Curated annotation (Swiss-Prot):
It is a single-pass membrane protein. InterPro entries: PSII_PsbN (IPR003398). Signal peptide: none annotated. Pfam families: PsbN. It comes from Marchantia polymorpha. Belongs to the PsbN family. This is Protein PsbN. It is found in: Plastid, Chloroplast thylakoid membrane. Keywords: Chloroplast, Membrane, Plastid, Thylakoid, Transmembrane, Transmembrane helix. GO terms for cellular component: chloroplast thylakoid membrane. One of its GO terms (biological process) is photosynthesis. The lineage of its organism: Eukaryota, Viridiplantae, Streptophyta, Embryophyta, Marchantiophyta.
Amino acid sequence: METATFVAIFISCLLISFTGYALYTAFGQPSNELRDPFEEHED
């Protein structure tokens, strides 16, 4: 396999993994522990 193909596949997998982790953190189980600054600072 050529080096450019390997690098492209590696970067694509890395980007997809990061996006999946970000979505899991935002909407999955850990989202219950996130604070909402708008609810904390009501005027």
